[in-house]
A protein has these predicted regions:
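Histidine-acidic metal/acid-base catalytic patches
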Residues: 2, 83-84, 142, 147-154, ...
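N-terminal pre-domain/capping segments
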Residues: 1-73, 79, 152, 258-263
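Surface-exposed, active-site-proximal loop segments in enzymatic domains
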Residues: 44-66, 90-102, 196-207, 248
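Acidic-and-aromatic substrate-binding clefts and catalytic sites of carbohydrate-active enzymes
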Residues: 1, 10-26, 93-98, 131-137, ...
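Active-site acidic/histidine proton-transfer and metal-coordination neighborhood
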Residues: 56-152
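Surface-exposed alpha-helical segments enriched in charged/polar residues
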Residues: 4-5, 22-29, 72, 76-79, ...
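Alpha-helix-loop-beta-strand connector modules within alpha/beta enzyme cores
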Residues: 29-44, 107-119, 147-148, 212-222
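Hydrophobic faces of well-ordered beta-strands that scaffold small-molecule active sites
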Residues: 9-13, 35-40, 86-88, 124-126, ...
Length: 263
C-alpha cells in the first residue's frame, strides 16, 4: 500500500515498500512536523500478508512471533526516524476462537507492548477493533492500556462506528468509554458496511449529515476531545496526497481543525 496520512499539523506513515522510503524520508524531513508510524512502517519480505494483518491473538505461535517481529521492527525505525509514537492493530479476523486463550494471549501481548514501549521510549497506541472474535469491547481495550502510561487507545471513527453496528452497541457510548484513555484519532467517514465495501475510507466534509446516514464527526470529536484536547488527529484516507490535497478534502480538514480549536 504505502500511505502517508496527513493529520492536523502532523503525519502518519503506514505500510510502505522499501523502494518508497527515500522520497518519504525527504518529504517528512522537509515538513519539520511531528509524525507517527502505523505498524508496519514498511512491510518486509518475511511478512507476506496485508498491512492490516496481525497475529497477536492467533493460535499459531509462529505467526504470533511474526507480528511481534514486525512491531519491534517498526519501533526500531520509529526510534531511528524520531517518530513520536506508534499505532498498532491488536485484533484480526483469524484470531483464536477459544475465549480463554484469547484472554491469555491478550495479557501476554500487553506485557510485550509495555516492554517495547519502555525499551524504545516510545508510546504505543492500540487501535480499537473487533469486527469478529472475543476481544471487541471498549472496556477490554481500556483494561489493556490503563495501567501503563505509554499505552493508549487510537479511536478509528469509521471502524468504531461499523463495529458498534455489527455488535448492536451504541456508538457514542463506545466512544465515551474509550475517550478518557484515547491518545490519537483516525478520522474518516462512512454510511455503514455496504457503503464502506464500495467506498472504503471517505474523507470527512461538513456537508455530511447524520440524518443521511453519515457518522456525526463533530459530535464524536467533541466527546473525545472533552477528555483529551491534545489527541493527535490523523485523516486516514485511501490516498497519499503529499502536498496535492484536493479542495474538498482540504475543506474537511479545515472543518475538523475548527472543531478542535473550539475545545
Amino acid at each position: 500500500a504505502g500511505y502517508l496520512h496527513t493529520g492536523l499539523d502532523r503525519y502518519e506513515v503506514f505500510d510502505f515498500q522499501e523502494d518508497g522510503l527515500g522520497e518519504l524520508e525527504s518529504f517528512i524531513k522537509s515538513k519539520k512536523l511531528p509524525f507517527s508510524f502505523h505498524v508496519p512502517f514498511f512491510r518486509p519480505s518475511y511478512f507476506p500478508y496485508t498491512g492490516v494483518t496481525t497475529f497477536f491473538l492467533n493460535d499459531d505461535p509462529e505467526k504470533r512471533a511474526l507480528s511481534f517481529k514486525l512491531i519491534d521492527s517498526t519501533m526500531h525505525y520509529a526510534n531511528k526516524w524520531s517518530a513520536d509514537f506508534v499505532v498498532t492493530h491488536l485484533t484480526w479476523k483469524d484470531d483464536s476462537l477459544d475465549r480463554k486463550k484469547v484472554m491469555d494471549l491478550t495479557s501476554y501481548t500487553k506485557s510485550k507492548f509495555c516492554d517495547l514501549a519502555d525499551r524504545y521510549k516510545l508510546p504505543i497506541n492500540i487501535e480499537f477493533g473487533g469486527y469478529s472474535g472475543h476481544f471487541h469491547e471498549p472496556e477490554q481495550f481500556v483494561d489493556f492500556v490503563k495501567d501503563h502510561s505509554s499505552l493508549g487507545i487510537c479511536i478509528d471513527i469509521g471502524h468504531t462506528s461499523l463495529i458498534s453496528g455489527i455488535r448492536n452497541r451504541n456508538f457514542f457510548r463506545d466512544i465515551e468509554i474509550m475517550a478518557p484513555h484515547t491518545k490519537s484519532i483516525h478520522v474518516w467517514n462512512t454510511k455503514g458496511l455496504e457503503h464502506n465495501k464500495k467506498h472504503n475510507h471517505v474523507p470527512v466534509h461538513p456537508s455530511q449529515k447524520a440524518e443521511d446516514g453519515w457518522v456525526d464527526i463533530k459530535k464524536t470529536l467533541e466527546i473525545i476531545l472533552g477528555y483529551n484536547k491534545d489527541c493527535n488527529i490523523i485523516f486516514e484516507y485511501n490516498h497519499t496526497y503529499y502536498d496535492n490535497i484536493p479542495d474538498e478534502v482540504q475543506e474537511g480538514m479545515e472543518w475538523v481543525k475548527e472543531i478542535v480549536n473550539k475545545k
